[in-house]
Amino acid sequence: GNVLFLFYSLIGDSPESIMMLKINLDTWDVASSEKVLSPKKNYEGGKLPLTKSMPGSSTLRYGGPVKELRDPCIYKEDDKLYMLYSLAGECGIGLSQIYNIGKS
């Protein structure tokens, strides 16, 4: 069937992480969302304390990185799927390959 995979993050989460929602476009059934990526590595802010995420750059708000991943962007190249995302409160950009999406 026709399925939409929606990747997003939620301002206010602690830590803000990348979520995925699966929507069947034939029936408009929505599966529950699941966390697919959260800050673990040092460069993602993984060892920093938990804070409630807020809009905007953490450099402007806190003077440096925070424990947050946000703003996912999906793209395809050579039949491979990738996700770009901002990390550490918009202090950098991460890249991750996506495997097995939509597989049973």
Language-model regions, residue ranges each:
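Carbohydrate-active catalytic/glycan-binding domains of CAZyme proteins
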Residues: G1-S104
